[in-house]
Amino acid sequence: MNYSIHRLWYFLIFLACGFTAVAQDSTIQIVFTSDIHYGITRVAFDGASKVPSHVVNVRMIAAMNTLPGLRLPADQGVRAGEVVGPIDYLMITGDIANREEPPAQSAAASWNQFNQDYDQGLTLKDHRGRPLEYLLVPGNHDLSDAIGFYRKMTPRTDPTSMVGIYNRMMHPAVAKTNATWHFPADKINYSREIGGIHFMFITIWPDSANRIWMEKDLSTVDAHVPVVIVAHDPPDGDAAHFRNPNGAHDINRHDRFEGLLEETSKDVQEPMGKEDGKPTNDAFEQRGFVAFLKAHPNIKAYFHGHNNWNQFYTYSGPDHDVHLRTFRADSPMKGKFSSKDETKLSFQLITIDPRSKTLTVRECLWNTDPQHPGKAPVWGESFTMGL
């Protein structure tokens, strides 16, 4: 009898240990950054001035590589207090290449530097011991490099970074080249099922044209499956990114619409005025997106870059009639705050528990002591939400 009891006891212990391992292994972890802007320099970094983006990104990559050995903060979030462990994905929401306005380098040079630094420098592995997977969307700089801009660029167009992102994410049977890639036919819109969550990755912003693709994509998703949108622009968009409503609808210095979205601006815009002025009103277009959100209440969160600072907030729409949990990422090169104070440089770690459909986003401050560049990253803000 005692022998049988002991066997049962050991079996229960084995099961408990197994369930603990499964619980940890079932979590999904994503490093999230944005606007890495290869091709320009930071005013100051680590005691030096005019520091190239290559140098800054290599330092950020080194900080990312330390994540698996760090312990998560005791913030009541997913896996709080546990060792981070494997990282499954790296998510970058665009502006990999800076716009090639002199003296910035070409998109081709920037894309090549990105590949070299990240592909060779990142050592992070997923739960199966494989190199992590990239989740990329283009930014306004990547796309302007490809289709042109209203100020001088050298060369005038270079779609290399758009083509590179397209081939990495869309996996075409025949890889696109700079000669065979065309906009808007070759948008970078795709989705992934990650931990029981449907992630939608969108070119620039979910305008009316992109929402046609999104609607079709969501038609295959059960209404009870949580959905997350990932794009470069914030939920309130950027009015300058729409198609020019004037004249030939082109990209020109007078109107300063950038033509990055297929949807034509329908809002009355303020006069441009000063030389660097640009369109600012996109309330009409936002209302179309809000209607889409209301039609799909399983859209639970939105991740983006473009504005260049770390923020966890709620998007409420131009009429304050929707509530979408939103996460904005810092830029290592052009941070609104971190460009002036490098101790505020950050990326985010997203940890997802697929069983409870819970997501925690944690700010990771990676340069809090510039005098000691190898110092481990420090946890900042965190936010946990149910999906």
Please place each PLM-identified region on the residue numbering:
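Active-site-proximal segments of metal-dependent phosphoesterases and phosphodiesterases across multiple
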Residues: R211, D222-I299
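Short, solvent-exposed loop/turn elements at domain surfaces
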Residues: I28-I30, Y38-A44, A209-W213, G335-K340, ...
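Bacterial N-terminal signal peptides
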Residues: W9-G18
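N-terminal active-site segment of His-dependent metallophosphoesterases
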Residues: A23-S106
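Active-site neighborhood of phospho(di)ester-bond hydrolases with catalytic His/Asp-centered motifs
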Residues: F32-S34, D88-D95, R130-G139, I202-T203, ...
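Bacterial N-terminal signal peptides that target proteins for export
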Residues: M1-Y10
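Extended active-site neighborhood of metal-dependent phosphoesterases/phosphodiesterases
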Residues: R99-E215, S219-P226, I251-D267, A295, ...
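Short mixed-charge
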Residues: L67-P86, Q120-P131, V174-A179, G288
